[in-house]
């Protein structure tokens, strides 16, 4: 994984964990969990691409990797919508900056995962 992407994930996760969104803290914790899961999935796909011979290993380990890929894209879309919603309702500039960076990161990671998946197909 690109070192900038790693630091972006870590920075956004740290910033989100510091936010106090009142009654919606459960939602925020869910978003943080989704971000962490997405980070791990993106890393594993990237590693599989780096070892192109690993495609067969990936498919044999997880015969349903295409379904898993589809599920990850659904999670990304959900996170994008959730982040956009947060951007619309927040007036706190720290939160706005954090969610804008999170949105940018999600769009970049979605594109990277698409690129990786096409290389694996």
Swiss-Prot record:
Keyword tags: Host nucleus, Host-virus interaction, Transport, Virion
Cross-referenced InterPro entries: Flu_NS2 (IPR000968)
Cited Pfam families: Flu_NS2
Primary subcellular site in the record, as a coarse category: virion
GO-annotated biological processes: exit of virus from host cell nucleus through nuclear pore
S-S bridge residues: none
Function field: Mediates the nuclear export of encapsidated genomic RNAs (ribonucleoproteins, RNPs). Acts as an adapter between viral RNPs complexes and the nuclear export machinery of the cell. Possesses no intrinsic RNA-binding activity, but includes a C-terminal M1-binding domain. This domain is believed to allow recognition of RNPs bound to the protein M1.
Protein name: Nuclear export protein
Upper classification of the organism: Viruses, Riboviria, Orthornavirae, Negarnaviricota, Polyploviricotina
